[in-house]
Structure formats: C-alpha cells, structure tokens
Amino acid sequence: FFVVSCVKPSISFLPEFNQIDLLIENGFIIDGSGKEAFPSDIVIVQDRIVFVGKTKFTNDDYKYRIIKKIDGDNRFITPGFIDLHSHGNPLETPSMENFLAMGVTTITLGQDGSSPAVQDLSKWMDQVSEKGIGVNLAMFVGHGTLRNLSGIGRSNLINDSKMSGMLDTLNETLKYTFGLSTGLEYNPGLNASLEELIELAKI
C-alpha cells in the first residue's frame, strides 16, 4: 500500500536524504551469510538499500517523508535469488514474471551451448535493454551457436579459416558477456574435438 507521511527517526541515519522511497518494517532478514535470520527494517532510497536495522520511528517523528511503507509482518526478507541455469526469450516475455514469482531476480541466458543466432550479440542485448527486462541478466555465448555462425555446424573437421573465425567471434563477444557455455551432449557441440575446446578455452 502507498502512504505519505512525515517522520523523524529517533536514531541518526540517512542524513543526506529527506525522503524515503520505501520502508519495509518488521521483517526477518536472511542475508545469505549463513547467520540466523534477524529482525530488521530496510530503508530504500532511489532504488538502493541505504539502511538495514531497526529504524525505531515514533508517531511524533517528522523529519523524513515516506512514500511507501510495507509491513513485513514478521516474514522473511531475502536477497533476490540467482538462477545459474535459465532459459527464456526476453524479447518475447520481457517481464520474466515466472522468475520473479519464485524470488529470482538474476538469470543467466545462453546456456547449453546455445545463444541467439546473431553475428553481433551486442545488438541483440541492446534490443533487450531498450525493450526492458524484469530481472537482471547475465549473458553467455553458446559454443554450438559459434559453430553455426562460423559455418562449421555439425562437422567433425574444421579448417584453419573457420576455426580462426570462431575464435575471433568468441574473443569479441567475451568483451560484453559473462563467458562461453557448452552443450557437449547436443548437436552441434557433441562433434567438437578436445583440441577445439582447448583452443576456445584459451580465449
């Protein structure tokens, strides 16, 4: 629910702000460090967590304007989960609500050796950015896709020219992706030799 109120905290924090965009109160935080959940409030300003702790606001306080307040109702509050093996098309389903519904806020795409079949993956990523996406995205380039783009496909034999082309494409793509993914049980990746994989790994 949305509320607009003016409060002044009984403890000193956030001296540089006069407005709190979101205040989550009365929750139990699991921070991922391994320690037990602890009672706390969370203060968010301009989409950033700026304070974690008990704010101890009172009805007579008035310093900060709170735009939105959520009662945690003694429920658990956790960081967003990272899905290390995801599949999806953000150009078709940019909201990614299926991930958000499970608490996932970061996904990885380009798994199993398959990424969008475009020579310049950065342009595809620009399209995703322009369209907007509901989660954070860590993008990988697929080994099988590189084989197809280089004209190697399912072949067991690779000449120097095509191998060089694949390595050049990988080298360029790694400038803006998180790495190379493989799917060696799928075509065309299952046709790769150990020597090919070693050369790719060197990049």
Put a short name on every predicted segment:
Residues 189:
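Glycine- and other small-residue-rich loops at beta-strand/loop junctions that grip anionic moieties
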Residues 27, 86:
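Active-site metal-binding loops of divalent metal-dependent hydrolases
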Residues 72-77, 81, 88, 92-182, ...:
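Divalent-metal coordination cores built from histidine and acidic residues
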Residues 13-22, 29-79:
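Histidine-rich, glycine-flanked metal-binding segment
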